[in-house]
Amino acid sequence: MKQLTRIISMSLVAVAACFTASCSAPSGYDGYMTRPYEIRGQHYQPLSVNEALTYDETGIASWYNESSFFGLKRGNTSLGEKVMPWHIIAAHKTLPLPCRVKVTNLDNGKSLKMRVNDHGPFIEGRIIDVSPRAAKKLGFKKQGLSTARVEVLSVGDGSYKKKRPRKKFLFFF
């Protein structure tokens, strides 16, 4: 009888362990990723969550080369996600992954919210790389580059959001 109780107990522990493992965060990150990395000998340290939530920068935006989507170079982002040209995604050198940003093309006023899920661009003077579809929606796909403003909206799984000023309402009676 003791042996049967022991087998049942061990089985329950094994089932509980499997259930717990299946509920953990996918893609190897717990909410967000701020691990330092190195590309071509250059060291990059992603911003902390608090620093990222105040991030608001203007600079040059570019878009991923489409040939890398359809050739042998098709691959995964830094989070291990598949890259497809129709996704509205972006890459940034120092923002924690993933995060949501609003990119505004300052040449034409168009803006778009997108998910940053990769590191890059690694070309001097550029602040963000967007997918071909995002570049088309922002109106700079033909030009290749644009002056853009990048504002962080949230970091990670959405738990960390930029605080917006509360609107004050005046009531007149």
Predicted regions and their residues:
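Secreted/periplasmic proteins
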Residues: 23-173
